[in-house]
Amino acid sequence: MRVQLVSALAFFAVASPAHAEWWEAKTDHFIVYSESSANNAMEFAQKLERLDMSLRSLQNIKFSPATSDSRRLTVFRFGDIGDIGRLAGYSGVAGFYIPNLSGSNAFTPARSAGLDTGQLLVNRPDSRTNLDPQQVLFHEYTHHFMFQHFSAAYPSWYVEGFAETAATIDLKPDGSFHLGNPPQYRSDLLFGMLNVSVERLLASTNKPTGEDQYGWYTVGWLLNHYLTFDPSRQGQLKQYLRAINSGTKPADAAVQAFGDLGKLNRQIQSYKSGRLPGVDVKIANYSPPQVEMRKLAPDEVAIMKVRMRSKRGVDKKLAPDVARDARAVAEKYPNSFAVQLALAEAELDLADFEPQALARAEAAADRSLALKPDSVDAMTYKGRALLERGRTDKSQLPVARTWFAKAYEEDPEHPAPLYFNYLAYYYEGVAIPESALIGLERAYDFALYDPQIKLVLARQLLAEKKGTLARSILMPYAISPHESKGAKKMREVVDLIEAQKVDEARTMLAHEIDEQERKRKAGQDAG
């Protein structure tokens, strides 16, 4: 996996206890890799599955298990907060989430500094105002859940405020849960260190400052809580979000839905000082989550650091280190499927910056397939290597498509083979068959959280003169055009669509996609 920006800090400093065990805990919606005891890993996985049940109950979404591992969130649980921060590239990070076409990933600590593995599951009421890694993970999973199930456009304050509301869900022993507890770790900011008004949160078009971004989490949580639980405001939040998605500017949508924003600001300031309401929810037909447990083999443990670094994402500076470390492990475990697959991924990432790595990536994919011929990931990596060759030798593209077709036959719900199959036609410059177009749309449905699919699908829809559909896909980027250069560009594309200039919109979007790829491969920030 690739990223545009990541700290240059190498991930060699992960502190692991001697002879640490690693367990895989698999539930209906999660695959957890945990550096802990088996019981602790199982309890943790059950807790995550219960969070998913709670969110489904709140959003009236059917309880159904994922039928493809690509639809499950993979959670890497290891080390302490310091180790998580080193992997993220930012100190003090207690957990983070990376959406990805081939399967999204989250990272969370398995232990507190100085404590034995697993003690984060123990309640510590003397630490209420400390940042709780469990609540961070609940927050990040709520993002994944929202992006996976809803394609609508949401302003940043609501995305973070809703996730903060869900982060403090209290899971009860009987299977019920409580919604509405305040995030105590935000209390200092809410009661004196932050000066972000409702007007500024909802109506500003200025480039957001660091204080504004803190406001998304704090004032955003407070506003979402108030609009959710205060009887006098019932229905206003839905009205506001509907207006934004219909094309109303966020500032206008806020006034239409909430009225006087100054009055709203005064009301939430009073609201935060009182006793906050909440609700107890009982899940119908609740039964404890089932967990499949498997202890990782020595080769899987040996490649785990490489795998986590790849899943976190690499840039031009880090990719060579990750690939080098993958090769070192592969020398020790030449007949390990897990190791060869991780090596193929690392070399593919490196090939973005060093084309000579492409042959090594394809060779590792071939070895993976020899060890496990039905591996969807190995088939996809093989196809991706051929796809990249096809950028300069178009005769490789039909061959690449055969591998994506095989991967699709093995797992029809995995978005990556569908997406790359479409790209193989697009790069070849031939008429794209209906089956590939449908495949791209299915990939989008399976991976609503992936930003690149959205841009590519919007480009295709514009080529088909389907401006209204393309606009709906781009709106999540366009509603806050001040947040980044890329978001501003998406706003310009949407403006062209709304002006019925669909061809110009497609040209601009295609150029933006190409420019982002060029900058990424050059090791630059694509903005």
Q: Where are the regions that the model predicts?
A:
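TPR/TPR-like alpha-solenoid helical repeat scaffolds
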Residues: L418-Y427, R459-A463, K485-E504
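Residue-level recognition of tetratricopeptide repeat
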Residues: E164, H225, E345, R384, ...
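Structural marker of alpha-solenoid helical repeat scaffolds
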Residues: K332-Y333, L371, E410, D445-F446, ...
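Juxtacatalytic substrate-recognition/specificity segment
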Residues: A20-P155, A166, D170-K172, L202-G210, ...
